[in-house]
């Protein structure tokens, strides 16, 4: 041991004197080793037993916050035993490499010994590490998370953590695709790298483990990666479908289930929107060729069994097929459930499997039920209540845009001509040697011979799935003047709608826009189509780049990736001349996006050449992950006198209902 004890010494447990040795002549109660729970120092970082990709240290996501307390008396050294790594689907470990549980009194406990091949470090050494980690909770350019917010978050903190994680992931994807990462940072899993950076910086929330709802996470929220759920405390396991902790009362300790993920790996019945038949974890998951072995009542299965007796609330996350990317899944938080019953039945491999019947608690907002309804509307198996038009675009869009009013008797918005292009656009000149690139087939990320990539400061603005990496002063896309193919990935804003949109009547803000599909942060939504005008005489159906807009940060923080800040593109837009677009007579779905002071959509100026001239376009992208049937909104901005002061006249009263509402817009 590092403390320098002699071979036959035993640490004393009291605060007493001198030698601190135990009197060996005293009779003590002896228990079998297997009945003893390991005693671990609070500040010790535990290592994970799961195997991770080469080049990645284990993740340590949840840890006990440092408390201001007097130095405790010497503790007995923790007992450690080796356990072989568990199978990926069996493992109850989270990104912290352990269950890191707490009892009902809020004390951190653990349910199993951890493997160790190195001598244990002293508490003093571990304490130094914690202090360093806590100093890094505030990240330059991103904002800080207090120690209290690390334990218990809120909506704003949860959004900040998710946006910071996703901005890092997008940047790492961009670097990976352009082959600019060195061998140390290079990885095919940018999400793991981003998660590791966030963990090392202590940038996370809801670390305090709890039964029931998680502060700042709302029913219906969507996640595109399990790591996202880990970093906001919704589900602490990056691989396992069952998350649990050890609860302690006066008589005993027992595992209690916190959350489950039903993602189709096991043979789960998920057809009913309020009932879920969940299969336990173990040997027999949906594989006919596996040797018949009964599942064991241990770890997550035992936690579910105990929770069925305790009748505690369990968070349920449903993994569903992404309607846009068929090979991916979207995770939707479906709220709180209780286990009504459990039983054992024969699985497909012939072994016994545990089954648990989860029943959703009443009075919660609909989540999975919304997905089920959308599925029926898309297949035509159920009629849409309040449907006025099946396709408002009359075939202009490749995906139909429905028009719905289930609020009142209004039959539709005022007449206009649907168009998905910009009319009467005014060209402007740039100091460029050419109006297009000479790439064969499609432009390739990292190819600095491509003139369009050069105009984007050497970065390909989008990653492979069409997600925008960063806000830029201008995004230079390939256009009709370029020699690359029309399906070039640098033409994202010219490819039309990718999600099925619906124009609907709101309760108090006229007509609005929403999507049948979940939308990932950075996804292109639509262009603002209409007529370019010199001056806006009216305030309705007008987009104006000269307005004053609230600043916000969306890009990754370069210091997290050890990049030089001076080489990073600013988020301030650079527009050669003001662009004003009216969609009153001609327009597309963008005209129906309402204003919000806390929007979920932002606009980005995009430039490409047509007919030997450059034209400016306004493209809209998702600011964060947007659940299906959520209204899409952006900041309309405020008018300006010309001397820098905002003009109150002509403004409209804001009804966005946001906690950050500024009262008016336009």
In which residue ranges do the predicted regions lie?
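Conserved SET/PR-domain catalytic core that frames the SAM/AdoMet-binding pocket
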Residues: 335-346, 505-538, 621-640
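Extended, intrinsically disordered, low-complexity regulatory segments of metazoan chromatin-modifying
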Residues: 1-133
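Acidic, glycine-rich low-complexity segments with interspersed aromatic residues
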Residues: 89-95, 127-129, 133-135, 139-159, ...
């Amino acid at each position: 041991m590092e403390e320098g004890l002699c071979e036959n010494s035993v640490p004393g447990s009291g605060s007493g004197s001198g030698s601190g040795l135990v009197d060996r002549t005293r009779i003590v109660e002896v228990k079998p080793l297997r009945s003893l729970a390991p005693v671990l120092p609070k500040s010790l970082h535990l290592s994970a037993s799961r195997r991770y990709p080469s080049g990645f240290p284990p993740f340590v996501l949840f840890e006990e916050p440092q408390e201001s307390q007097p130095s405790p008396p010497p503790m007995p050294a923790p007992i450690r035993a080796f356990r072989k790594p568990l199978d990926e689907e069996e493992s109850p470990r989270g990104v912290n490499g352990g269950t890191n549980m707490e009892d009902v009194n809020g004390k951190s406990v653990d349910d199993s010994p951890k493997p160790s091949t190195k001598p244990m470090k002293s508490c003093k050494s571990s304490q130094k590490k914690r202090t360093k980690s806590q100093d890094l909770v505030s990240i330059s350019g991103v904002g800080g998370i207090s120690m209290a917010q690390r334990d218990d978050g809120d909506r704003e903190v949860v959004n900040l953590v998710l946006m910071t994680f996703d901005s890092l992931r997008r940047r790492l994807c961009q670097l990976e695709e352009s082959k600019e990462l060195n061998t140390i940072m290079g990885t095919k899993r940018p999400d793991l790298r981003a998660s590791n950076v966030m963990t090392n910086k202590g940038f996370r929330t809801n670390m305090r483990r709890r039964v029931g709802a998680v502060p700042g996470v709302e029913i219906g929220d969507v996640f595109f990666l399990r790591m996202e759920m880990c970093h906001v405390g919704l589900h602490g396991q990056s691989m396992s479908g069952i998350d649990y902790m050890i609860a302690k009362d006066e008589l005993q300790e027992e595992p209690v289930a916190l959350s489950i993920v039903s993602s189709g790996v096991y043979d789960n019945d998920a057809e009913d929107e309020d009932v879920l038949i969940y299969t336990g974890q173990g040997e027999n998951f949906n594989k006919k060729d596996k040797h018949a072995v009964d599942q064991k009542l241990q770890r997550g299965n035992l936690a579910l069994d105990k929770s069925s007796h305790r009748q505690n609330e369990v968070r349920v996350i449903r993994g569903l097929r992404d309607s846009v990317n068929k090979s991916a899944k979207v995770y939707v938080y479906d709220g709180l459930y209780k286990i009504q019953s459990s039983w054992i039945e024969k699985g497909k491999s012939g072994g016994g499997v545990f089954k648990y019947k989860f029943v959703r608690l009443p009075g919660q907002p609909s989540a999975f039920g919304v997905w089920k309804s959308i599925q029926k509307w898309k297949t035509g198996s159920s009629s849409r209540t309040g449907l006025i038009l099946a396709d408002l675009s009359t075939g202009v869009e490749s995906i139909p845009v429905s028009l719905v009013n289930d609020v009142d008797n209004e039959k539709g918005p005022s007449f206009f001509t649907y168009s998905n292009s910009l009319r009467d656009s005014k060209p402007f000149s740039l100091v460029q040697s050419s109006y297009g690139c000479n790439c064969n087939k499609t432009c390739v990320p990292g190819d600095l011979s491509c003139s369009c990539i050069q105009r984007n400061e050497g970065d390909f603005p989008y990653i492979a799935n069409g997600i925008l990496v960063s806000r830029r002063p201008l995004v230079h896309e390939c256009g009709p003047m370029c020699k690359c193919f029309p399906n070039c990935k640098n033409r994202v804003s010219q490819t039309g709608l990718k999600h099925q949109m619906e124009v609907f009547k709101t309760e108090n803000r006229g007509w609005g826009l929403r999507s049948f599909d979940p939308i990932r942060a950075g996804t292109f939504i639509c262009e603002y189509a209409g007529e370019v005008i010199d001056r806006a005489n009216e305030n309705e159906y007008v987009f104006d780049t000269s307005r004053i807009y609230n600043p916000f940060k969306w890009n990754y923080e370069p210091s997290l990736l050890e990049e030089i800040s001076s080489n990073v593109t600013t988020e301030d837009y650079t527009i050669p001349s003001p662009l004003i677009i009216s969609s009153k007579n001609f327009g597309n779905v963008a005209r129906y996006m309402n204003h919000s002071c806390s929007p979920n959509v932002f606009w980005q100026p995009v430039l490409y050449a047509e007919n030997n001239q450059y034209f400016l376009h306004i493209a809209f992208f998702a600011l964060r992950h947007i659940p299906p049937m959520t209204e899409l909104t952006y900041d309309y901005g405020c008018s300006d006198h010309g001397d820098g002061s905002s003009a109150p006249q002509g403004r409209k009263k804001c009804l966005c209902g946001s906690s950050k509402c500024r009262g008016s817009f336009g």
